[in-house]
Swiss-Prot record:
It is a multi-pass membrane protein. The keyword RNA-binding does not apply. The keyword Transmembrane helix applies. This is Transmembrane protein 105. Disulfide bonds: none annotated. It is found in: Membrane. The gene is TMEM105. It comes from the Eukaryota. The lineage of its organism: Eukaryota, Metazoa, Chordata, Craniata, Vertebrata. The chain crosses the membrane at residues 23-43, 94-114. Signal peptide: none annotated. Keywords: Membrane, Transmembrane, Transmembrane helix. One of its GO terms (cellular component) is membrane.
Length: 129
C-alpha cells in the first residue's frame, strides 16, 4: 500500500484579499491622495504656505475668504477624519465619502472608471488601429 506524500508548496495559498485587485486599490489610493494633495496645495495662497504671519497690530492676517476657514483645509480635514473611521478606509467607503469634494477628473480616476487594462492591456496596439 503506497501513500502519496504531498509536499508543502513554496507559495502560500492565495487568499481573496491578496492579488491584483488589492494592489490596484492601493495604487489607485496613492494616485488619488497624491493628486488631491497637489490640487489643494495649488489652491492655497502663498501666505499660508510660508507660515502664519501676524500683522503689526498683532492680530493674525485675514484669509481672502473672510472669517471662515480655508475650504481646501476643511476638505482635507474631513478626508483625514474619515480615513481613520474604519478598518477598510482605503476601500469604497473612503473613496465614496471623499468623492464629492474632488473635481470629476480625479474622482473618475480614483473610482477606477478609467480601466487600465483597456488602455494598456495586451493587444491594445492592434485593437487601437
Amino acid at each position: 500500500m503506497l501513500l502519496k506524500v504531498r509536499r508543502a508548496s513554496l507559495k502560500p495559498p492565495a487568499t481573496p484579499h491578496q492579488g491584483a485587485f488589492r494592489a490596484g486599490n492601493v495604487i489607485g489610493q496613492l494616485i488619488y491622495l497624491l493628486t488631491w494633495s497637489l490640487f489643494t496645495a495649488w489652491l492655497r495662497p502663498p501666505t499660508l504656505l510660508q507660515g502664519p504671519r501676524t500683522s503689526p497690530q498683532g492680530s493674525p492676517p485675514r484669509s481672502p475668504w473672510g472669517d471662515c476657514a480655508e475650504p481646501s483645509c476643511l476638505c482635507e480635514m474631513k478626508i483625514r477624519r474619515r480615513r481613520h473611521e474604519g478598518p477598510a478606509w482605503g476601500q469604497s467607503g473612503f473613496l465614496a465619502g471623499g468623492l464629492h469634494l474632488v473635481p470629476s477628473s480625479l474622482s473618475l480616476a480614483a473610482c477606477g472608471v478609467v480601466r487600465m487594462k483597456g488602455l494598456w492591456g495586451r493587444g491594445a496596439g492592434i485593437r487601437g488601429r
